[in-house]
Amino acid sequence: MRVVILGSGVVGVASAYYLARAGHEVTVIDREAGPALDTSFANAGQISPGYAAPWAAPGVPLKAVKWMFEKHAPLAIRLDGTRFQLQWMWQMLRNCTTERYALNKGRMVRLAEYSRDCLQALRAETDIQYEGRTGGTLQVFRTQQQLDGAAKDIAVLREANVPFELLSSDELKKAEPALAAVSHKLTGGLRLPGDETGDCQLFTTRLAALAEQLGVKFRFNTRIDALAVAGGKIAGVQCGGEMVRADAYVVALGAFSTNLVANLVKIPVYPLKGYSITAPIVDAAKAPVSTVLDETYKIAITRFDERIRVGGMAEIVGFDKRLRQARRDTLEMCVNDLFPGGGDTANASFWTGLRPMTPDGTPIVGRTPVPNLFLNTGHGTLGWTMSCGSGQLLADLMSGKKPAIRADDLSVHRYLSETDGEHRPAYA
């Protein structure tokens, strides 16, 4: 089957690789000059199945009000004048209940755990290198309330059989020796030894090369204008003056997926703006050895070979990609507070990207009401964590194979209801 994939971020490239491995003829189209040059370029660098959790959580509405008045708040909201933004925020609030949080986190962990298994199999088969580390991830708490609040996450981890360790402040240095100098600031931590880290952009570039060896064709610097429809199916992709045709089409354009398919199916994928800095290491003994998540500021600090990546925060501001100095100040403050002297933050690069977020946090992977149109988008902050599993899952669905995990609650159909023949967002 001839398949066109729109988008060459980590999710699009993973989709291409697994579809090609399943025997399909795959072409990837992207406006950028190469793979992973947009949302996947400088993310936080973590592969964290156990920490897969929706931003829509109990207590978040009250926290959001408090964060409005804090200098280093992890969340900021600026109205963009669209009805879609208001609708999306309202549906996110509806998912901030204990019941929905558990449901959403459960299916996110399911896909994320499967994705890690797929990544491990890929690594064993291809020996792909991406500055990866398998030292686990450590979530650190600055208050007793945060430590006590970890109970709801631990319950889901137990149910999913995800290994974890709950550490006291004195025990944190066992996982991250450099934290010994600042343990008095922390109340404890939750460590997931099975999590991994690495450079997502490097991984995606090398996976694209492996995909090319399987026959995948990449068309970069190519504008994607519209999906052409005929006879109730996609007839092609309008790329400037050219119509690119295939048997099936996959939209993996992150936050840009929503507008492209708007006339065909309504998907609640909104851009959630995040930031990162990447600093050279100046003292390895004072730097992290893996990924540390600061629960207070919602920031991840990740060790690469010779660099530290610090990323996080969320701004609900539409497609605004301006770099804000205040956000850089927060990232620098956080890493220098936990790992003083570890990295040269004054000479760090500064980046922003738009995460494709759904109101319930779960991505949209699978079929749509249009017979030959498939989606692989809405992964939020977990694009890399879920990329290999999402790609394999989609390849199985498109090849007529039964997926290795439950997939029905991951498709767009969980959001759709039939009303007067139209597909309207139900946000279930």
Swiss-Prot record:
Keywords: FAD, Flavoprotein, Oxidoreductase. GO terms for cellular component: cytoplasm; plasma membrane. GO terms for biological process: D-alanine catabolic process. FAD binds at residues 3-17. Its cofactor is FAD. The keyword Oxidoreductase applies. Gene3D superfamilies: D-Amino Acid Oxidase, subunit A, domain 2 (3.30.9.10), FAD/NAD(P)-binding domain (3.50.50.60). Pathway: Amino-acid degradation; D-alanine degradation; NH(3) and pyruvate from D-alanine: step 1/1. SUPFAM superfamilies: FAD-linked reductases, C-terminal domain (SSF54373), FAD/NAD(P)-binding domain (SSF51905). It catalyses: a D-alpha-amino acid + A + H2O = a 2-oxocarboxylate + AH2 + NH4(+). Oxidative deamination of D-amino acids. Belongs to the DadA oxidoreductase family. PANTHER family: D-AMINO ACID DEHYDROGENASE, SARCOSINE DEHYDROGENASE-RELATED. This is D-amino acid dehydrogenase. It comes from Burkholderia thailandensis (strain ATCC 700388 / DSM 13276 / CCUG 48851 / CIP 106301 / E264).
